[in-house]
Amino acid sequence: MNQAVSERQFAPHLSLDVEGITVASTNLDNVFNARKIPSSDGSCIFGSLNLPEYQRPYRWSEEQLARLLDDLRGFFSTDAPGHDFYLGSIILHQQGGDGRERGILNIIDGQQRITSLALLHCLQKGDKGAPALEFNSPESYRRIQHNLRWLEQQKLPRIDFSRINVTLVVTRREDDAYRFFETQNTSGVRLGGADIIKAYHLRSVIPATQNDFARTWERLGDLKPLVATLMKSRHWQSLRWRNVASDRDPLLERKQIVTELAERTLANTADIAYRPLQVHRDAWGKDMHSVQPGYAMRQPLGSGVNTMRYVAYFHGLRQTLLDVGEAPPKGSFAYYYKRLSKDACGSVFLSRAYECALLMYASQFGTARLLEVSLWMFRVIFSMRLIREVSVREDGVQAHIRDNPLMDWIASSHSEDELLEYLRSYKYTPTGAGLDKHSIKKRFVESVSITLHLNLPWPNPIRVAAEYDAELCAAIKRISLADIARQGGK
């Protein structure tokens, strides 16, 4: 039986000064069948469940399903208790509809539980009485098919959906719906920063194209590494330096991502790319313009299409540039990137900074002289491994980039030659501490030495440290000249 309840009783975490929020207690059978449900403010919640475009994919694992099944088996046994099974709260955004006409109930929080119970409903009772949810994400389709196969192999309880109680928290304002989506985590699948910025920007896309943009976003896959790189490029600026939150502090990390890539974006729908323009004038004064395609990593972003295409562009650039495979051609940029940044194991934190610098360079200058520039940038970034005795900490890497503003050198340079002047003039003093034992530092130097054919005076750690940088610079010059020769002297 439906009953109206108070906000304070069932939703104490919500701000009660927000208008347009209503609460109701009902059962899942009523929700699935889109029946009229009386709410706390005297109105009716009346609508069909729907997954809005900004929802993240269905991701519940077998382990999470198993926990739900155990709870349901324990409740729907022969000695079932007299009270109903409480599923928790579901946050919905009601679009249209009133006491007479059925509207749409967009699921803001509770998708994982609702979808899982809908699968159980289909296995037990078929499609009749189950919500007609549409999933646009290929990941959701794959997970649903996998979970259905898994559920078919389990001993399922006989579920009475009219005895599954749920608290509905309903808002009729889209801004409140997004705010709840951003802050909720009751389903056991934590919202990542990429999930939230997707939700934020889809709201600014015209409705006719929302599904297309949502599908495009889902096809990008895991955006966490890319978003972390974008955050570094936008935070590591000398004029407005901000440390980037560690992924070991997911709440602060998420807050920073939402602030930078959602809330601080400009309230317009113009898709603007800020690019440097080169004007070439011939002897007769005729101009020829040259513009690098794509977006600038640090550019201002507009809400909606602009930010979504910005992210998609850098996702594609990252794949093209840094997904180098297991055996890239020897002597290529991909070969040295893999050998020096991945295989040498200098530090995951240094590798992430290196990835940021490479993407910033490629977005500004393209791939011209990429190998040469990448090796000099490697020298600047990974010099920290030679400066430190053993450990390279995440906060230490941020301090290293702040003291040696590589990202600013890239962003402010007008040409590859100007950037190379910054890179070549960088000075540091390696230390031999840690090179006399089987340490990460020693293994890194040995790996770099093998890859670049450095002539180092092992096993003397003091001399190795003293001669390392000169050998490294000579190797970079030798490899760069060979690369220029391969390209016909260009």
Predicted features and spans:
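Flexible coil/loop and intrinsically disordered segments
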Residues: 1-490
